[in-house]
């Protein structure tokens, strides 16, 4: 299993940041390899489930995602299933008028699809993508 953790401080209140991330339709705006989010459905816990399409190493991978935990002003945890199995955690820490956002993901690289030789390269690319995700989030939330 691979993992990555990235943090960024956003000049916005926790509520604004968490509200933006709560809508899975926003994720392709900040996540470069996330091609599509569809079939979004509200869950009783205040989160959502959805289907997604993701591009990894030039291949299109599909699956589902579901928010399994949502604590206002604190964190949101999602599980993905399908071509990529993962647990994604967003944590939110107020810092005066700003919010420190940390994005952690634990995931399985789909070895049968991509091959063992590609695994190290994929992990490195995904780690860089984590930087882009939090920086894109900062740019969009601060601009709105």
Each model region followed by its residue ranges:
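Beta-strand/loop substructures that line and gate deep hydrophobic ligand-binding cavities in soluble
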Residues: 79-131
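Intrinsic-disorder/low-complexity, polar/charged segments enriched in Ser/Thr/Lys/Arg/Asp/Glu/Gln
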Residues: 3-9, 47-49, 62, 75, ...
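Generic structural detector for well-ordered beta-strands
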Residues: 7-11, 53, 66, 79, ...
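An N-terminal domain-start capping segment
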Residues: 1-12, 55-60, 130-133
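Hydrophobic ligand-binding cavity/cleft-lining segments
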Residues: 1-44
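Glycine-rich portal/gate segments that line the openings of hydrophobic small-molecule binding cavities
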Residues: 29, 38-84, 132-144
